[in-house]
Amino acid sequence: MNKKDIATPTRTRALLDKYQFDFKKSLGQNFLIDVNIIQKIIDASNIDERTGVIEVGPGMGSLTEQLAKHAKKVVAFEIDQRLIPVLEDTLSDYDNVTVINEDILKADVVEAVQTHLSDCDKIMVVANLPYYITTPILLNLMSKSLPIDGYVVMMQKEVGERLNAEIGTKAYGSLSIVAQYYTETSKVLTVPKTVFMPPPNVDSIVVKLMKRQAPIVAVDDEDQFFKMTKAAFSQRRKTIANNYQSLFFDGKQKKYIIKTWLEDGGIDPRRRGETLSIKEFANLFNNLKKFPELEF
């Protein structure tokens, strides 16, 4: 990296002035201005000349330019039309970058991968995710039939800790279950808010999620499974039996059946959702077949 890199206060301010760019809080725009942090993200992603990269929210291209130097191809989704001419400028030296001016949650990511990254040996998502939609983005990408091998993503520290949380902790919840289901998760580093322009209100964290060859547990309907696990955390102070009364149709009239279903799965109805492992949740879900009265 050198003095011309985008991820410096001087270069970022110069670009802001050149394009008279104003940050939009509604889009969670906070541009990274520390080349050392970017290098650590690159190192953690293990990308090389055979790797295709999906980036979400490239901003002015501070991370994108470094991805382009190391990866075979980069596809970056940017929702803000105002940043497209900026990116055309900052990334003009790289013919292996495709910028798509679309909302990642509405874009046809499958088609984009087939069109631009089909000749890559592996695909990684490497991004400084917009904080306001971090969870929807991850859930959306994980649940699609995409050949993504892993993710190295920066996000709000609180959300990152939920992804990597252990059973029984305050951070452990439905998002922890989804992440654990699809990936092996680890923390890369904590990032202070001072290395962004403008600085966000909270510190950030970089998390690495590597896709499992197969989900850690077997369930026949992932959407319903995640709906069931989410309900277990709907009111964290309540027991799992009480939370599930709100999930099932006529649940309050089926207290005894819910209790029997839980006990049949080896779960004490007085336990709270945060004490159950993903394997225990999967066992409960698969055990629902024996209790046709319990529908949701």
From Swiss-Prot:
Domain of life the protein comes from: Bacteria
Pfam family, one: RrnaAD
Entry EC number(s): 2.1.1.182
Name by which UniProt lists this protein: Ribosomal RNA small subunit methyltransferase A
Binding site for S-adenosyl-L-methionine: 30, 32, 57, 78, 103, 128
Main location: cytoplasm
Catalytic activity: adenosine(1518)/adenosine(1519) in 16S rRNA + 4 S-adenosyl-L-methionine = N(6)-dimethyladenosine(1518)/N(6)-dimethyladenosine(1519) in 16S rRNA + 4 S-adenosyl-L-homocysteine + 4 H(+)
InterPro entries xrefs: KsgA/Erm, rRNA_Ade_diMease-like_C, rRNA_Ade_Mease_Trfase_CS, rRNA_Ade_methylase_Trfase_N, rRNA_adenine_dimethylase, SAM-dependent_MTases_sf
Membership in a protein family: Belongs to the class I-like SAM-binding methyltransferase superfamily. rRNA adenine N(6)-methyltransferase family. RsmA subfamily.
Recorded GO CC terms: cytosol
Protein role: Specifically dimethylates two adjacent adenosines (A1518 and A1519) in the loop of a conserved hairpin near the 3'-end of 16S rRNA in the 30S particle. May play a critical role in biogenesis of 30S subunits.
Matches recorded under SMART domains: rADc (SM00650)
Swiss-Prot/TrEMBL keywords: Cytoplasm, Methyltransferase, RNA-binding, rRNA processing, S-adenosyl-L-methionine, Transferase
Enzyme kind, highest EC tier: transferase
Cellular location(s): Cytoplasm
PANTHER family: DIMETHYLADENOSINE TRANSFERASE, DIMETHYLADENOSINE TRANSFERASE-RELATED
GO MF term set: 16S rRNA (adenine(1518)-N(6)/adenine(1519)-N(6))-dimethyltransferase activity; RNA binding
